Amino acid sequence: MSWKNKPFLLKPAGKDYLWGGRRLKDDFSKELDMEPLAETWECSTHPDGPSIVSGGAFDGKTLTEVLKAHPEYLGTHPRSEGELPILIKLIDAKQDLSVQVHPDDAYAKEHENGSLGKSELWYVLDAKKDAKLVYGFYHDMEKQVLKESLLNGTVEKYLQKVSVQKDDVFYIEAGTVHALGAGALVAEIQENSNVTYRMFDYNRVDKHGNARPLHVDRALDVVDLKGSASPRQ
């Protein structure tokens, strides 16, 4: 068999976001030198965390480099040079993720240097008994009321919270306010984008004592204000 026809293994890129835990190391034997380990980007050509080929003819190269050198791997009509249209990751939420929203493709293209927007799908690999997630609002919201609640820290009373169980599937369309809750372990398939507008972060600080930045104005540009969305697919 020619090397061109052989599959190859990938090493993931890791992310040490403050809400992560150890399950990706303990349950999946991920050998990444970071603590906590919040996410592993298993199949990625995104510049913020490309996967690295492990072994074989392409050992040590990024997946992006391989696909640029061999565009035939992407078929006859690749969308862009060396890039996959999706990104696949594992997520370990030891703590709640920030309340956030992602733009659609049109908004991201105009306001985020031509980036894709971000719709995503979560498959729940495991979840603690009391695990929940935020998915949209309890009822229709007015933009000014939402803005005020974000600025004064009362937004949680408007958020629709949903219990999470193993094998649940959730589709998070661009524009949907959402947050993965503590105790959930998920696999995510998403558009190849890292554009996130953080709306509320529970007044947390990072390991340096700094509050993480919020993106309220852009979030208000893209958020879907309709309430009572149906989360499960």
Task: List each language-model region with its residue ranges.
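Gly/lys/ser-thr-rich phosphate-binding loops in alpha/beta enzymes
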Residues: 22, 87, 159-168, 176
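Short, well-ordered, mixed-charge alpha-helical segments that flank or form enzyme active sites
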Residues: 107-108, 130-135, 141-146, 172-173, ...
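A short hydrophobic beta-strand segment most commonly corresponding to one strand
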Residues: 120-121, 179-203
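Active-site glycine-rich loop that binds ribose-phosphate moieties when present
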Residues: 141-171
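Short helix-capping and hinge/turn segments at secondary-structure transitions, especially at repeat
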Residues: 175, 194, 225-228
